[in-house]
From Swiss-Prot:
Membrane topology: Multi-pass membrane protein
Name this polypeptide is given: 7-dehydrocholesterol reductase
Gene (name only): DWF5
Phylogenetic classification of the source organism: Eukaryota, Viridiplantae, Streptophyta, Embryophyta, Tracheophyta
Family: Belongs to the ERG4/ERG24 family.
InterPro entries linked to this entry: ERG24_DHCR-like, Sterol_reductase_CS
Substrates-to-products reaction catalysed: cholesterol + NADP(+) = 7-dehydrocholesterol + NADPH + H(+)
Species of origin: Arabidopsis thaliana
Pathway annotation from the record: Lipid metabolism; steroid biosynthesis
Length: 432
């Protein structure tokens, strides 16, 4: 269970604030970008005149077509997750001493999804621009539907947990927000967090990136170079994610954060709306960068995505070989750390202190943030709202780095202190 580091009042207030304000923010972001020319000032003026009633008036009502799109997409991804073949992959040992098993078929599902989506458009069966035209209704349906989904997860955690990595802290708000189960499943093979985080959330990022590109083409008869750079970089990033999906199952999202509002609602709603927002902005705000500048941005973005990937690959290879590998051409520097599981077993982990992981404890967040900047900067600087995702991601990753440090300090004790003495900086070498 996630530990709280603030007073109970601050903890509850922050959770309730996110529960209350994240849903309307999604609608406000969409409304401002699509209907107010991306101008926060115009949106502020609208609410200055109309007050709370203005939010009620602009909030799209979920329509049948929105529900159909969500259901067809979700069902398609669930079927691919279940039926596509994939390598058997074991996740890390859980706090209760369990080791989850996955089927790594994400990359195949990704290519099948994009090929199907583009094929439906190419042969005139389905126009992806329809998704953009009903985007507000889709986001509205996702907001309410995902909230109900999280309620069902909360109930499942109480009455039918999938493993011993579950339980209540005794507080409804915390249980609902952080979740009851670490690895909730339907049956033995359908992992709910893999579905929400990877197959619905991350897959929607690629699908919507393509959608925005097609919509701009429908409006203007061409696709601007800024949109091309944005779309290519987003697709490269998501392709990297699914190529490395088995590694993602070792991260905090899967291995430490339980399935509650924070993770599941975030992946089902926040990822499709906020993470894709630079592309959403560019639909109606095309920018011609010129070939030279577009290539510079594209190359810089791809380089950052590669460095981010190589950081994760380096650590994954180090763990896979139990430290018997080369890191930047040399034997890796490491710390052998022991810890005790909640069931009382003593385990050991290897902490890598060289390569990318010798620069800072979470250096991989630097190229991650820069990647987001490079697929956003094609929008230039007329409206700062296009950069909301970059700002949000920076705050999220800095907070995640602190939470991970706190968790590892509690888990490894003196070994983590030694690790921090060897790798002094948390994220930015020489600065922080």
């Amino acid at each position: 269970m996630a530990e709280t580091v603030h007073s109970p009042i601050v903890t509850y207030a922050s959770m309730l604030s996110l529960l209350a304000f994240c849903p309307p923010f999604v609608i406000l972001l969409w409304y401002t970008m699509v209907h107010q020319d991306g101008s926060v000032t115009q949106t502020f003026g609208f609410f200055w005149e109309n007050g709370v009633q203005g939010l009620i008036n602009i909030w799209p009502r979920p329509t049948l077509i929105a529900w159909k799109i969500i259901f067809c997409y979700g069902a398609f991804e669930a079927i691919l997750q279940l039926l596509l073949p994939g390598k058997r992959v074991e996740g890390p040992i859980s706090p209760a001493g369990n080791r989850p098993v996955y089927k790594a078929n994400g990359l195949a599902a990704y290519f099948v999804t994009l090929a199907t989506y583009l094929g439906l458009w190419w042969f005139g069966i389905f126009n992806p621009a329809i998704v953009y035209d009903h985007l507000g209704e889709i986001f509205s349906a996702l907001i309410f539907g995902s909230f109900i989904f999280c309620v069902l997860l909360y109930i499942k955690g109480h009455v039918a947990p999938s493993s011993s990595d579950s339980g209540s802290c005794g507080n409804l708000i915390i249980d609902f927000y952080w979740g009851m189960e670490l690895y909730p499943r339907i049956g033995k093979s359908f992992d709910i967090k893999v579905f929400t985080n990877c197959r619905f959330g991350m897959m929607s990022w690629a699908v919507l990136a393509v959608t925005y590109c097609i919509k701009q083409y429908e409006i203007n008869g061409k696709v601007s170079d800024s949109m091309l750079v944005n779309t290519i970089l987003m697709l490269v990033y998501v392709t990297k994610f699914f190529w490395w999906e088995a590694g993602y199952w070792n991260t905090m999202d899967i291995a430490h954060d339980r399935a509650g509002f924070y993770i599941c609602w975030g992946c089902l709603v926040w990822v499709p709306s906020v993470y894709t927002s630079p592309g959403m902005y560019l639909v109606n705000h095309p920018v011609e960068l010129g070939t030279q500048l577009a290539i510079y941005i594209l190359v810089a973005g791809i380089l950052c995505i590669y460095i981010n990937y190589d950081c994760d690959r380096q650590r994954q290879e180090f763990r896979r070989t139990n430290g018997k590998c080369l890191v930047w051409g040399r034997a890796p520097s490491k710390i052998v750390a022991s810890y005790t599981t909640t069931s009382g077993e003593t385990k050991t982990s290897l902490l890598l202190t060289s390569g990318w992981w010798g620069l800072a404890r979470h250096f991989h967040y630097v190229p991650e943030i820069l990647s987001a900047f490079f697929w956003t900067v094609p929008a230039l600087f007329d409206n700062f709202l296009a950069y909301f995702y970059v700002i949000f991601l920076t705050l999220l990753l800095f907070d995640r780095a602190k939470r991970d440090d706190d968790r590892c300090r509690s888990k490894y004790g003196k070994y983590w202190k030694l690790y921090c003495e060897k790798v002094k900086y948390r994220i930015i070498p020489g600065i922080y």
